[in-house]
């Protein structure tokens, strides 16, 4: 599992969407059904938050942190994706059409 587009993400069921941005950014705006676990909290305590039997999609503003996190967790046996577009591109595409 790896990068995923927002359109493909919308087609999937039983996936946990995790916003890894800071709490303030999440509070200002986030994807529907997303929960917030900031990057540094998650990377330092992933086993506390995640279950290897579940599927996750991470996103951040530009996808750099979410991609590195997803790659690391996939190597450890977790099932994860990251949002290719990043949240800022998603937001621009949704609000400027």
Predicted regions and their residues:
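Rhodanese-like catalytic fold shared by cysteine-dependent sulfurtransferases
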Residues: 1-7, 12-15, 22-55, 61-97
